[in-house]
Amino acid sequence: MLEGWFVSAMPDLNHRNPFMARYLIQNSLWWIETLGLGGIRQDTYPYNDPVFMAEWAQAIQTQYPKFTIVGEEWSYNPLRVGYWQQSAPNADGYESHLPSVFDFPLQKALVDALTNKESWDKGLVEWYTALSNDFYYENPKALVFMGDNHDMDRLYTQLSENTNLHHMALALLAMAPRTPQLYYGTEILMQNTAKPHDHGLIRTDFPGGWHGDKINAFTKSGLTSEQKATQTLFAKLFQLRSRSEAMRFGETLHYAPNDGVYVISRFAENEKLVLFLNKNEEDRQIDLSDYKELQGYDQYYD
């Protein structure tokens, strides 16, 4: 949709009016400079005029080359998502100048992979297939990957409040060759199961620091054992990612799931990491000879 209202309460601005277009560009530059912003999340990207959006993004990138802009193309089709990323080889020649786009296809694959029963085309293979589409994207590592956000059910709710699956999701969020976005409360199993799709509940205050709060997630006071364990795992995973060149910038090698087990490796010049993900209820013994490419590891963690 290029003309009309996105919803009745949000009238479109006329981006084809040169005075309006110039004002919006100048206004964006002013706010970036005044507040020292590091990035913009641009909502509902395809609903804007594409020619103007390219001019807007280019103007910002020219003035602030290290500035980040993430566009929201809420589609589960990677072809539509990839179209909007800068330098994409689009058939119509369109150049967006947009550095990053939200990876909704991989978000859906994450949930489907963990909640669907394993079969030849369902379960972990859905994640494997989605990640294998990276050849299409111009810069897949710049895509923003999330388990949930402020507009969809909490990740813990999407996973039917299964803590084991939630922990697997956190591991994939940390390990994926993407730029992760983490919604507050994911680390303490915040959920909206009582009212699915209710934005008020999805956006509930983070517990702790507010008058009358009985739970303080900053100090762990009042958290359940499962919440504490999840918070600890969350911290370990993303502290590791913050130190790891391989997890942030390295190459990726992964294997088709086998018997409910998925293996993914991230590696850089002097570092290798591998994740074995077991979706089964029971332990599985891994035959490392099946993964001959993954040699040279000297530390293992459960």
For the regions a language model picked out, list residue spans one by one:
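Substrate-binding cleft of secreted/luminal carbohydrate-active enzymes
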Residues: 170-191
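Active-site-proximal helices and loops of the catalytic beta/alpha 8
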Residues: 27-29, 33-138, 143, 161-163, ...
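Asparagine-centered strand-capping/turn motif at beta-strand->loop junctions
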Residues: 276-280
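Alpha-helical scaffold elements lining the catalytic groove of polysaccharide deacetylases
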Residues: 15-27
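Surface beta-strand/loop "capping" patches
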Residues: 249-271
